[in-house]
């Protein structure tokens, strides 16, 4: 993966910020007896921070409407759409090749230039999907609906993941069939030297940010192995 844009580190910082206190206050103030909305509230805070950071840096944050229950936000930097997922969910999507997941659809329409760069061979099932024109057309049409007017301004999609256990933020690259290509760990940064960039919220517990010597870091980025290759939860 070529040198990453500096702005992505700002999004790594807001993506890894904990909103536990904010969410607990919502439950407490409303005297909720259950916490069914916890995952949704967590992502609402994350997407708010992503949108605010995009606005503060004059970047576009597309809204991807997936129906009544879920809307995702990403950010376009230099023609690349970065979407945000928890690491375990990302691994599930590419392991199982969830054919109609939004990541699968957008990757199918935007990442064909990366085909052939994967390390592993295609599974028989995935190989059969290569010849499924109906599926491919369906995925591309879905991608066009999700991205709307932003579709033609996007050249590639990458996935920024957050590992809840290790607190690591990683930028992942996949081909058109969501086969893993490359990953760069962007966690090791000093929060004290990152500008707030006009975000309206104050982070409760920032975990990553930009070091003063970030340019050196960018020029020799640390590549990581296949994200699901060594996961501890495999098979559980």
In which residue ranges do the predicted regions lie?
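A short acidic/basic microdomain associated with nuclease active sites
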Residues: 54-84
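A recognition module on extended beta-rich or small alphabeta surfaces enriched in W/G with H and D/E
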Residues: 80-138
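Nuclease catalytic cores
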Residues: 39, 43, 47, 88
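Non-membrane alpha-helical secondary structure
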Residues: 3-7, 15, 42, 135, ...
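Short, contiguous, helix-prone interaction/anchoring segments in small proteins
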Residues: 46-56
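Interdomain/boundary linker segments immediately adjacent to catalytic/signaling cores
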Residues: 1-41
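Short, solvent-exposed secondary-structure boundary motifs
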Residues: 52-53, 63, 147-151
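Glycine-rich, aromatic-bearing surface loops/beta-hairpins
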Residues: 143-236
């Amino acid at each position: 993966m070529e040198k990453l844009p500096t702005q992505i580190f700002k999004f790594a910082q807001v993506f890894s910020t904990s909103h536990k206190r904010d969410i607990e206050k919502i439950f407490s103030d409303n005297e909720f007896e259950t916490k069914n909305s916890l995952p949704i509230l967590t992502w609402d805070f994350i997407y708010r921070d992503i949108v605010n950071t995009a606005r503060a840096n004059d970047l576009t944050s597309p809204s991807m409407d997936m129906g009544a229950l879920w809307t995702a936000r990403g950010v376009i930097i230099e023609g690349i759409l970065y979407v945000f997922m928890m690491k375990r969910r990302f691994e599930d999507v590419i392991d199982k090749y969830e054919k109609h997941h939004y990541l699968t659809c957008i990757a199918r329409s935007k990442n064909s230039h990366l085909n052939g760069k994967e390390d592993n061979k295609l599974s028989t099932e995935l190989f059969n999907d290569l010849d499924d024109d109906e599926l491919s057309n369906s995925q591309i049409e879905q991608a066009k609906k999700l991205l709307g007017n932003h579709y033609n301004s996007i050249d590639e999609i990458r996935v920024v993941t957050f590992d809840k256990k290790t607190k690591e933020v990683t930028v992942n690259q996949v081909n058109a069939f969501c086969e893993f290509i490359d990953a760069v760990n962007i966690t090791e940064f000093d929060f004290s030297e990152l500008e707030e960039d006009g975000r309206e919220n104050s982070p409760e517990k920032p975990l990553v940010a930009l070091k003063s010597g970030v340019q050196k870091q960018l020029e020799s980025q640390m590549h990581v192995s296949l994200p699901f290759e060594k996961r501890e939860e495999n098979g559980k």
